[in-house]
């Protein structure tokens, strides 16, 4: 469509009608509706924008006002924030929102033996802490995404909503059946010292959420009713998106900024070391949470030995799935430099 002709009206200035942006895009909505990927075309698309434009709040494809003040809050290099899956994951997140109030069959929760109830409350107390920090951290980086790469910011917004819902649903589970919150540990407070987008993605998305997702996917093993099964199933669905964003961002970093390899290894060296040394750093090394998981997996405190055997299976799965993601990213050499505690849980490489 041609730009509208300038309309002259005495006393008014309609210079803004002299459009200097690209026009003429016509799109038919598809089976999934009108998606971000559909409009990712012409000068409005992200292709070819490896470096962001001027540091002003002008959205991609729009002409910036020459008077716009500059700022220094945003990442300029696309590789610092980009994920090739950001658009798809954002659309999926919008389509798969759920409500902890309406979509969980809370009526299926019946009184449980004290050891089982308190074990579940212990686990869910820990998870409320984990999810609070997992929602807090992305918010610190949202404003640093340049408008030319806004899809990454949109995805982080959906993650904050997801983590808020997880905190909400695990807190409700603590309080709904005669139990309550238990003594709080430190949680994943080490993540709050993160100072870079890619560092956040490596430690939160790849590492932390990857390990938590493995636990959520084992929800059938530790759940006592349909409500708990659905909680873990829906939470795992959300975590899969966060994890996918992290893996595809880090892969993009390795593809476009290969000189950052040792930087990424350094982040993971620190996190693997922390998980192996700090009892509050993770689900599998926190004694209180580990014992609660063993009680749930075994079916009671009198079957805790059986539960610990199942817990070891989960630990091995966590580490091996973590290693697989590293290989997808392009960090397969991490197998040789992984901490000994982790390396001992790795499956041997097929000959």
What are these regions (language model features)?
Residues 1-149, 153, 180, 199, ...:
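Terminal targeting/low-complexity segments that flank the catalytic cores of oxidoreductases
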Residues 114, 192-193, 207:
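Short helix-capping and inter-helix turn/linker motifs at the boundaries of alpha-helical repeat units
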Residues 127-135, 156-174, 202-213, 235-246, ...:
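Alpha-helical transition-metal enzyme core signature, strongest for iron centers
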Residues 134-196:
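Long, hydrophobic, well-ordered secondary-structure blocks that form the structural core
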Residues 173-188, 197-223:
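All-alpha helical catalytic cores of prenyl diphosphate-utilizing isoprenoid enzymes
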Residues 215-276:
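Aromatic-anchored, glycine/proline-accented short structural segments
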């Amino acid at each position: 469509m041609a730009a509208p002709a300038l309309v002259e009206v005495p006393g008014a200035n309609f210079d803004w009608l002299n459009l200097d942006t690209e026009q003429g895009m016509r799109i038919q909505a598809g089976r999934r509706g009108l998606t971000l990927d559909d409009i990712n075309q012409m000068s409005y698309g992200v292709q070819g924008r490896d470096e962001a434009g001027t540091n002003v709040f002008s959205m991609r494809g729009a002409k910036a006002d020459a008077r716009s003040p500059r700022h220094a809050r945003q990442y300029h290099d696309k590789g610092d924030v980009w994920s090739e899956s950001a658009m798809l994951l954002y659309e999926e997140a919008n389509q798969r929102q759920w409500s902890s109030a309406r979509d969980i069959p809370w009526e299926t929760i019946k009184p449980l033996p004290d050891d089982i109830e308190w074990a579940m409350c212990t686990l869910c107390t820990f998870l409320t802490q984990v999810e609070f920090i997992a929602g807090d951290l992305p918010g610190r980086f949202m404003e640093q995404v340049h408008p030319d790469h806004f899809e990454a910011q949109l995805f982080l917004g959906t993650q904050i909503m997801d983590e808020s819902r997880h905190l909400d649903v695990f807190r409700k589970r603590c309080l709904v059946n005669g139990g309550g919150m238990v003594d709080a540990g430190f949680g994943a407070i080490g993540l709050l010292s993160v100072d870079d987008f890619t560092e956040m993605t490596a430690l939160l998305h790849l590492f932390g959420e990857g390990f938590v997702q493995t636990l959520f996917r084992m929800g059938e093993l530790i759940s006592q009713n349909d409500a708990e099964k659905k909680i873990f199933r829906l939470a795992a669905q959300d975590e899969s998106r966060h994890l996918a964003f992290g893996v595809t961002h880090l892969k993009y970093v390795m593809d476009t900024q290969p000189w950052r390899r040792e930087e990424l290894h350094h982040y993971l060296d620190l996190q693997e070391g922390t998980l192996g040394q700090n009892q509050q750093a993770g689900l599998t090394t926190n004694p209180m949470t580990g014992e609660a998981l063993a009680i749930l997996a075994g079916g009671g405190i009198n079957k805790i030995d059986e539960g610990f055997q199942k817990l070891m299976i989960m630990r091995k799965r966590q580490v091996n799935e973590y290693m697989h993601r590293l290989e997808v990213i392009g960090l397969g050499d991490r197998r040789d430099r992984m901490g000994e505690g982790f390396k001992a849980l790795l499956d041997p490489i097929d000959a």
